[in-house]
């Protein structure tokens, strides 16, 4: 009976620990979590789509699997070699055989290390290429979405999909899938080798497997919970930082730094607590698996030692010193991949969830697509016609109602009206940023729906009130990566739109740095750069949407002079805030609630004493009072 006491002690320890973990798992109640993303794809569908990106690199994956066989072989063969060497040393010692055994072991080790190195290099290269392909497809798809669709998706969400989520997918190709495959084969290979060597000791090792399964199930529950907490806290703090760093000037103006710091500290501490919980979960799981490993080693030494001393085990198996050494190494190599499998499963689920988020964006069908018979426009004269056009952003809420007008080539036409009258909407429809529900819009007598979108927009130049400048230089913001444009052409255009007056004063001229969104330039300077960017691409139709709003008087005079020059370039459409800037327009269209009230020249509309006359009179008196 005393011979069994050590085994009973080991079993009691494992049983108590397992019971405590099961009790803890039962007591911890899962809170019903509100997931910001509901999964709609099954794992098989996701893997099939990812396989499409991996297919071009199938040959390289085959090479990786071939190289992986060497490292698997090392894990299975090396314990047998060490066991044989132990028996050689403890038995009839022969130096040549010892050298031969060491040489074989060293050779297997070198091949394993080399294969592992090349396997890692190939996987990293292939994985990054796959993710690069995926990112490019995702970015291209985002570019194809309409303005309406882009308005519905937060920019931060798109950035996360292109960066963070694709990084999570990258881990699956560069590490997880191959490691999971290798671990499974290593476990199976070790089991076969142990059974062939000594089935009694193998059965002893397998007695610990149920406890590993229990620990793994419990670990998965707690690790998922901890992982979600970290993810939620990270998202929360990133959102807070994005908003408050953008509005930090407002915080400073109102002196609310301490209050904002208190909010940030609370969110930062929440993230720290979540990270500590995740570390604790992993910190508990690894020692538990290690405890099982130590217990199995103790049982090995006890049963193996008893069998070695007695010459035979309980089931009649013969155990040598080499067998014990071999099993000692096998047990170590058996528990390590099992521990890795449990941890990597969570990362795999995370990668699959990230994949679904990426595919959910790629599955959004663009609302603005070319017709099957769409044509290319080699040139545009600039004739524009609206025929009974109706449009609404939301069903039943018409923004434009039966709008009809005609614009001749090289005419300058202004759209006037109160906020929400439909001015900017008309300009957006001309460029096919949105799809109208009824009527026709013609360019040079051709329905714009029969023209390729890229071809149509290539002939338009849009200048908006909120000018967007990219980080880079003045030159890069004007040419927009179009090749073949010389500095002389750029400077000529800058002089044409009066942008040279401030560019010449800069230290680096066209190479002057442009910071994020062009915040190191004034609103007027950004607008002049926008004019230069538009003119250099030689548009046939120019669109100015509130381009002279919020600009000082001196800059407005420069812009007015630029506009006069630009009228000769092509057809010009203007949405004006200041009516004084459109007095020389060939035609002024007055809108109200999506309908055209009146149209004509400046003098003709004043003579009518209608809505335009009222707007002009009010604005004139306001300017007189301000003056």
Q: What are the functions of these language-model segments?
A:
Residues 363, 370-371, 377-627:
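ABC-type nucleotide-binding domain
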Residues 26-43, 66-67, 74-87, 108-155, ...:
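Juxtamembrane helix-loop junctions of ABC transporter transmembrane domains
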Residues 2-3, 74-78, 84, 115, ...:
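Hydrophobic alpha-helical transmembrane segments of ABC transporter permease domains
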Residues 92-94, 100, 193-207, 277-356, ...:
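Helix-loop-helix
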């Amino acid at each position: 009976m005393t011979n069994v006491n050590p085994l009973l002690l080991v079993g009691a320890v494992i049983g108590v620990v397992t019971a405590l973990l099961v009790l803890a798992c039962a007591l911890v109640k899962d809170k019903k979590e509100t997931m910001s993303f509901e999964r709609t794809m099954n794992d098989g569908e996701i893997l099939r789509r990812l396989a499409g990106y991996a297919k071009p690199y199938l040959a390289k994956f085959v090479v990786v699997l071939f190289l992986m066989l060497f490292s698997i072989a090392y894990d299975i063969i090396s314990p047998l070699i060490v066991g044989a060497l132990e028996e050689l040393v403890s038995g009839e010692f022969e130096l040549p055989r010892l050298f031969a055994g060491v040489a074989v072991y060293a050779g297997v080790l070198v091949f394993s290390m080399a294969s592992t190195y090349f396997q890692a290099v190939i996987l990293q290269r292939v994985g990054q290429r796959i993710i690069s392909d995926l990112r490019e497809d995702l970015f291209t798809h985002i570019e194809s979405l309409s303005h309406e669709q882009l308005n519905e998706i937060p920019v931060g969400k798109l950035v996360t999909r292109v960066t963070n989520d694709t990084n999570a997918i990258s881990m699956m190709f560069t590490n997880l899938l191959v490691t999971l495959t290798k671990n499974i084969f290593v476990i199976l290979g070790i089991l076969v080798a142990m059974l062939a060597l000594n089935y009694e000791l193998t059965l002893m090792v397998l007695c610990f497997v149920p406890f590993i399964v229990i620990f793994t199930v419990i670990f998965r529950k707690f690790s998922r919970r901890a992982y979600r907490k970290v993810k939620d806290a990270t998202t929360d703090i990133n959102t807070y930082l994005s908003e408050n760093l953008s509005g930090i000037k407002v915080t400073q103006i109102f002196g609310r730094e301490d209050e904002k710091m208190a909010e940030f500290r609370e969110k930062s501490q929440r993230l720290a607590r979540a990270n500590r919980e995740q570390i604790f979960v992993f910190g508990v799981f690894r020692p538990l698996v290690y405890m099982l490993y130590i217990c199995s080693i103790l049982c090995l030494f006890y049963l193996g030692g008893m069998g070695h001393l007695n010459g035979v085990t309980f089931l009649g198996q013969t155990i040598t010193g080499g067998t014990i050494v071999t099993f000692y190494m096998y047990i170590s190599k058996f528990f390590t991949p099992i521990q890795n499998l449990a941890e990597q499963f969570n990362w795999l689920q995370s990668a699959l969830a990230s994949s679904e988020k990426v595919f959910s964006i790629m599955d959004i069908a663009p609302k603005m697509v070319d017709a099957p018979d769409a044509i290319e426009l080699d040139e545009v004269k600039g004739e524009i016609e609206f025929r009974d056009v109706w449009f609404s952003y939301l069903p039943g809420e018409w923004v434009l109602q039966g709008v009809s007008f005609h614009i001749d080539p090289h005419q300058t036409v202004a759209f006037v009206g109160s906020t929400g009258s439909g001015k900017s909407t008309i300009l957006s429809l001309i460029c096919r940023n949105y799809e109208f529900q009824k009527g026709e819009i013609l360019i040079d007598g051709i329905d714009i729906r029969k023209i390729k979108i890229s071809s149509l927009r290539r002939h338009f130049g849009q200048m908006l009130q909120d000018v967007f400048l990219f980080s880079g230089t003045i030159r890069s913001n004007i040419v927009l990566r179009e090749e073949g444009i010389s500095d002389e052409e750029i400077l000529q255009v800058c002089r044409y739109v009066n942008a040279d007056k401030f560019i010449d004063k800069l230290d680096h001229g066209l190479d002057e740095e442009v910071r994020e969104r062009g915040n190191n330039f004034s609103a007027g300077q950004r607008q002049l750069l926008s004019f230069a960017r538009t003119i250099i691409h030689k548009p046939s139709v120019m669109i100015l949407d509130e381009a002279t709003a919020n600009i000082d008087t001196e800059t407005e005079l420069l812009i007015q002079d630029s506009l006069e020059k630009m009228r000769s370039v092509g057809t010009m459409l203007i949405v004006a805030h200041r009516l004084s800037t459109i007095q020389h327009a060939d035609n002024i269209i007055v809108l109200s609630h999506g309908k055209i009230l009146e149209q004509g020249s400046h003098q003709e509309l004043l003579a009518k004493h209608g809505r335009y006359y009222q707007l002009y009179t009010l604005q004139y008196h306001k300017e007189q009072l301000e003056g």
